[in-house]
């Protein structure tokens, strides 16, 4: 699916991560059982070093409120002027009601501000931006997009294959109506591979072997039960390496934007080696493809792209391509124009006493 919008702009982005910081080197004994070779390999190939993890009492709404309040104050936005609050997450505070409605209360928003969730993972920022642009194209004026996860809650802390890979973080993005600003999106999904990245148990469906295409996800281990995240890492890597470059080429062709006019190509930061492989396949310049979020924050799911935008030293006006791939399986790319983008250094959330 490809589409174009011309009425919306991204005015600002803030990202909040929890205060508990973990360094992978400190987990040599507790997580890696003194397997120094595996630890060094994960650091080198995936690009891991540090990550931030929520405690049991910190959820998406807490980080989202922190990021949102900082963003709205920084942009001097009246909360009553917001038309919609969208929360994109796969780790909601509650099954019911939506995290957006709960956050609506925490932010003390007007009853005229509609609030709803979108269930998306690593590609979620693109899906959230797509919906926000659609709503503004139809007449809305200001939309607050909250995007991110606390996936560490679904992973046993001693699972050395997954625990070091995922960090927690939530972004807040303000999208506003403007006179003219082109934005191009390309999105896709393939549900045949729904079980390649999945939490089998915990919702309404009872997990049974005949539901899944992948028999191995029903095989539990000491540090992975059915309530924990399962990832077929090899297949996810291969499919991402196929889908993201294809999506990137399609969005460039659809937008008719010359690659030379794009300042940054931002790929979901799930694996430093994967980003390097995509960059090489597409023959992109190193200085246009930042690849450092894994080292500082690990895989932030839907929050990785907004984190990149906050961490980059961007000019006053620039074009960027954004691409992501994740659970669903779902993926997408966009070519966006930015002007006077408001960002702050990554915020550290401290639990209110």
From Swiss-Prot:
Reaction(s) catalysed (UniProt annotation): malonyl-[ACP] + acetyl-CoA + H(+) = 3-oxobutanoyl-[ACP] + CO2 + CoA
GO BP term, pick one: fatty acid biosynthetic process
Lineage of the species this protein comes from: Bacteria, Pseudomonadati, Campylobacterota, Epsilonproteobacteria, Campylobacterales
Subunit structure, as described in the record: Homodimer.
Name of the protein: Putative 3-oxoacyl-[acyl-carrier-protein] synthase 3
Pfam families to which the protein is assigned, alphabetical: ACP_syn_III, ACP_syn_III_C
Active site per UniProt: 122, 268, 299
GO molecular function list: 3-oxoacyl-[acyl-carrier-protein] synthase activity; beta-ketoacyl-acyl-carrier-protein synthase III activity
Function: May catalyze the condensation reaction of fatty acid synthesis by the addition to an acyl acceptor of two carbons from malonyl-ACP.
